[in-house]
Regions:
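Glycoside hydrolase catalytic-domain context in secreted enzymes
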Residues: 1-665, 679-684, 688, 773, ...
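Terminal connector regions
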Residues: 660-705
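Thiotemplate assembly-line natural product biosynthesis machinery
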Residues: 374, 721-724
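Intrinsically disordered, low-complexity regulatory regions in eukaryotic proteins
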Residues: 694, 705, 717-718, 725-788
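Generic detector of short, aliphatic-rich beta-strand segments that form the cores of beta-sheets
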Residues: 577, 697-698, 728
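Low-complexity, Pro/Ser/Thr- and charge-rich linker/hinge segments at domain boundaries
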Residues: 700-720
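Short, solvent-exposed coil/turn linker segments
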Residues: 6, 328, 423, 436, ...
Length: 788
């Protein structure tokens, strides 16, 4: 595929079509030029059959199918099947067609005929994988990459070319309806983990589509809501995950967001899509819109949106804009080039032929293992009053909304219809005697809270029916193992009663969730997950409490950079469960050995020893605290982590190399990142809680920065530091100048610098020679003063 040759031979009409979707989840193909149609599909939790089947009814033309004539009296008009009741039922019961009506069976037969062609006759149900919130809690890049590989493999099975994920938006507020799709409230976690799922997906020649760029952090009024966000918060909190997926993950596609940022739609923002994404991050792939996010096709294309979805789009709007000279054809050509470049990469790397040769059993084995390993490493043990693991044959009752089948995934784009579900009762029966409540020694209570695209949560409460059961169990004094099968954090105040002996957060654990949970409660698997989002003590404590979901179509990100634990630390608020927290069935002895600057990195040496009787994993977390910063900063920020697996009695050395550039903060006045010289505290911990910091030491960074002491330093800084003031006084007085001028300006204009007050000297006293001599003397004096 010679891209420039194709563009040269395309008509303007064809170009206008290429930059718009052709069907709801399909791109535009140009047969005469050898440009294939591409299949797009959500998401990063598996194959969304609603989208596969719905799109199939468009491009395979169900409207004119012979089968349709059997069940529709009037076939003279095209019919849109996406979202139709008939198709919804076929999707829900695709793996149990006996439950369909006779008319639905006709549609089912037509769909299956086309699916058999696509799947090469394979009888294969898609997997359902844990979403980002649980993957984040694994703190394990390798596990996440394996999930990505499973997704890439399944994309090849189902003929999918662009997988619409991962979602790397920061978990700003636990009430966000799509919270479960994201990885963490912390940009370091997102930046280290999300690129791995991208690599896994793309290892099969499938393009990942990192979304939603940028700051798509709520569902309320999501289409067009205007978010007021400081540039510092964007640069330090909301951009790093996308930057990492570009630089480290090599993603071939980015999806922009519905919202506006500081007044400009993400689909139309040249600053966001060209200046930041392409010039700053180095992205050279294709930008597609979220579905229906483009309101002005010409403006969106001019701003940097290459492909407007869904289809059929508005190619005529592009055509007309070029003809009216309000959009240049060169800009259209640029978008076409980006779309074609992505298509070319896929056609050259796509492994469908290879995958089609694999036995179904082998595909199932690989995908099952990926889902199970992720669930095992991501489920978090939050409380354990010596209850777990339970002894084999303990009598248990299974209660709660998830007692028969756990909530394995969210709904909407991340929804998965499959026959590969975990049977909760069967999984627990492998170890325990499952009895009714009256006979049970323990009740395993699986409470749910679903996540849903398009709607945010109003509260952090469990479902009402689950709250009622927990209240009854508390009154009866029944021993409870509480399972939070939820889309995010829960208000624990009313439910964490004395009779609740253990609490597990499974979030939405995917198809292997029930197996992983039962193995964990039985002690076959040692919990090793750690939270990547804070559980607040109460909703009023949250940093976003006053700024979510905003007023109508406006929301202020008033917390700035103080998202999650950064806010709780700053406000000295104790959450219910802190960021980075998670328990184990074993114990660990962790030590910080030393930390030192080594070239352009900070080397941090730690040790961790398993002092218990069973194998387990600990997550060593390295935080940085800047005690004397010029800019306001959080009390600490996560900069590195590693999950370490240890046999009983085993001890390992764990060394971190933190790039000095990773300590940079964004200065909005200077409009740049800068690392300030001075002292930094290195904190080694097993969570963000103060009591989990096992070692602390201080280093000094001797770097040149915009904040280095000079004649441009503010008088406030100079006059409030004895060493600096002495350096200024001696250099000033050496020129015969009155040091009282420094004091006087400090009192009334402390924001001014030494350079700025030179103008107040009499002209005969501030000759060029004297000024130059003073500057040289002062800067020599401060050269040896260590910056706080």
């Amino acid at each position: 595929m010679e891209i420039q040759e194709i563009i040269k031979n395309m008509t303007l009409e064809e170009k206008s079509h290429l930059v718009n979707g052709a069907t709801f989840f399909g791109s535009y193909g140009i047969d005469r030029l050898g440009v294939p149609r591409m299949q797009l599909l959500d998401g990063a939790t598996g194959m969304n059959l609603e989208q596969v089947f719905g799109d199939m009814t468009e491009y395979e033309d169900w409207s004119n199918a012979e089968e349709r004539k059997q069940i529709d009296a009037d076939t003279s008009k095209p019919v849109n099947m996406i979202g139709s009741t008939r198709l919804v039922h076929v999707i829900e019961h695709y793996f149990e067609p006996e439950k369909l009506s006779e008319d639905e069976k006709v549609l089912y037969g037509w769909v299956k005929k086309h699916m058999d062609v696509r799947l090469q006759g394979k009888d294969y149900a898609p997997g359902c994988y844990p979403p980002g919130i649980l993957l984040g809690c694994t703190w394990n890049p390798e596990v996440i990459r394996k999930v990505g590989e499973a997704l890439g493999l399944e994309c090849c099975v189902y003929g999918v070319h662009f997988l619409l994920g991962p979602n790397v938006n920061i978990l700003r507020d636990p009430r966000n309806g799509r919270l479960f799709e994201g990885y963490s409230e912390d940009p370091c976690v997102v930046s280290k983990l999300a690129p791995e799922i991208v690599k896994g997906i793309q290892s099969y020649g499938v393009s990942a589509t990192v979304k939603h760029y940028a700051a798509n952090s709520q569902e309320t009024n999501r289409v067009g809501i205007d978010e007021t966000i400081s540039k510092r918060a964007l640069e330090e909190i909301y951009f790093p995950g996308f930057r990492a997926c570009v630089k480290e993950g090599g993603t071939k596609s980015i999806m922009n967001a519905y919202n506006r940022i500081n007044g400009v739609r993400c689909t139309e923002s040249a600053w966001l899509l060209e200046e930041k994404l392409r010039k700053d991050f180095g992205f050279d792939g294709m930008v597609m819109s979220d579905w229906g996010a483009v309101l002005d096709p010409a403006k969106a294309l001019a701003g940097g949106t290459d492909l407007a979805m869904p289809g059929p789009g508005e190619p005529q709007a592009i055509y007309d804009a070029v003809k009216a000279a309000t959009l240049s054809e060169e800009k259209v050509d640029q978008a076409c080039e980006r779309v074609l470049t992505a298509i070319k990469w896929i056609t050259e790397n796509y492994k469908k032929e290879e995958v089609d040769k694999l036995p179904v059993d082998e595909i199932i084995k690989q995908t099952d293992e990926a889902a199970y390993e992720a669930a095992c490493e991501g489920i978090v043990l939050l409380k354990n009053d010596a209850a777990c693991p339970l002894a084999k044959h303990t009598k248990i009752a299974l209660l709660g909304s998830g007692h028969a089948q756990m909530l394995e995934c969210g709904s909407g784009s991340a929804g998965i219809d499959t026959s590969r579900h975990g049977d909760v009762a069967a999984e627990f029966a492998r170890y325990f005697d499952v009895v009714d409540e009256a006979q049970a020694e323990y009740v395993v209570m699986i409470g749910i809270v679903p996540g849903m695209e398009g709607n945010d949560r109003k509260t952090l409460a469990l479902a009402d029916e689950d709250l009622a059961v927990l209240k009854r169990l508390a009154q009866a004094g029944k021993n409870v193992i509480l399972v939070l099968n939820t889309c995010g954090p829960i208000d624990m105040r009313e439910i964490d009663t004395d009779n609740v002996k253990a609490v597990f957060a499974t979030f939405l654990p995917g198809m292997a969730g029930a197996k992983a949970l039962s193995d964990m409660i039985a002690g076959e698997v040692n919990p090793s997950g750690k939270l990547t989002i804070t559980f607040p003590e109460r909703i009023e404590d949250m940093p976003t409490y006053m700024n979510f979901p905003g007023d109508g179509y406006h929301v202020s990100y008033g917390e700035g950079i103080y998202v999650g634990y950064r806010y709780y630390d700053k406000k000295k608020l104790r959450p219910r469960y802190p960021f980075g927290y998670g328990m184990s069935y074993t114990t660990f002895d962790c030590k910080l050995v030393d930390a030192a600057v080594d070239g352009d990195t900070i080397k941090v040496h730690t040790t961790v020893e398993n002092t218990g009787k069973v194998a387990g994993s600990e997550v060593i977390q390295i935080y940085i605290h800047d005690p004397y910063s010029t800019l306001a900063k959080p009390e600490k920020e996560l900069k590195a982590f590693e999950k370490v697996k240890l046999a009983p009695g085993e001890k390992k050395d764990v060394t971190f190399a933190i790039a000095i550039r990773d300590l940079a903060s964004y200065d909005m006045d200077l409009e740049q990142f800068a690392v300030e010289e001075g002292y930094y505290d290195i904190l080694a911990a097993t969570s963000s809680a103060a009591e989990d910091v096992f070692g602390e030491t201080r280093i000094y960074l001797d770097v040149k920065s915009p904040y280095s002491y000079s004649v441009d330093t503010q008088l406030k800084v100079i006059c409030e530091d004895d060493a600096l003031l002495e350096a200024a006084d001696s250099a000033w007085a050496a020129e015969g100048w009155d040091i009282g001028l420094i004091r006087n300006n400090y009192q009334y204009s402390p924001q001014k610098s030494l350079r700025e007050i030179l103008v107040y000297l009499d002209a005969h006293l501030r000759t060029e020679e004297k000024v130059a001599h003073f500057i040289a003397a002062f800067e020599e004096n401060v050269r040896t003063i260590k910056k706080k």
